[in-house]
């Protein structure tokens, strides 16, 4: 079974480079440029094995809003929060939600490892 990931990142170069890297690892990737787009995909797609979301994005919904929407629909989905604006408070909030927290710049091999190991554990 193929791992399916939703990648939410407003920076187009970061999003595209990350998506290309994950696809080369045989991961199916859907992309969203903002929180609203991501929430629409979450509510209309059957399932995601993992969600990777930037914290700060333009628009109404931020990364934690996206993660909360995913967890309401599928609490077992692996969620990874990525931010260039890290703080102990943000990290604690993410961990309280059961979310993997990574600060930018993110190592793509590390991200792939988190996706594959966590998605495998959470897939029924």
Language-model segment annotations:
Residues 9:
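Conserved acidic carboxylate
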Residues 12-30:
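Two-component/phosphorelay signaling modules centered on CheY-like receiver
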Residues 20, 31-50, 55-58:
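Acidic, metal-coordinating helix/loop segments flanking the phosphotransfer/catalytic sites
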Residues 40, 64-76:
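Short amphipathic alpha-helix used as the core "switch/output" element in two-component signaling
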Residues 89, 106-116:
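C-terminal output helix
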Residues 93-102:
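As written
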Residues 116-124:
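The C-terminal output helix
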């Amino acid at each position: 079974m193929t791992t399916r990931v939703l990648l939410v990142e407003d920076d187009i170069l970061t999003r595209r480079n990350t998506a290309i890297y994950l696809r080369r690892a045989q991961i199916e990737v859907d992309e969203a440029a903002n929180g609203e787009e991501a929430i629409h995909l979450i509510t209309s797609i059957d399932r995601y094995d993992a969600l990777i979301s930037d914290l700060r994005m333009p628009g109404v919904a931020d990364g934690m809003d996206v993660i909360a929407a995913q967890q309401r629909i599928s609490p077992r989905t692996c969620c990874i929060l990525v931010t260039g604006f890290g703080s102990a408070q943000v990290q604690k909030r993410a961990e309280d939600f059961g979310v993997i927290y990574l600060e930018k710049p993110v190592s793509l091999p590390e991200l792939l490892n988190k996706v594959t190991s966590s998605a495998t554990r959470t897939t029924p």
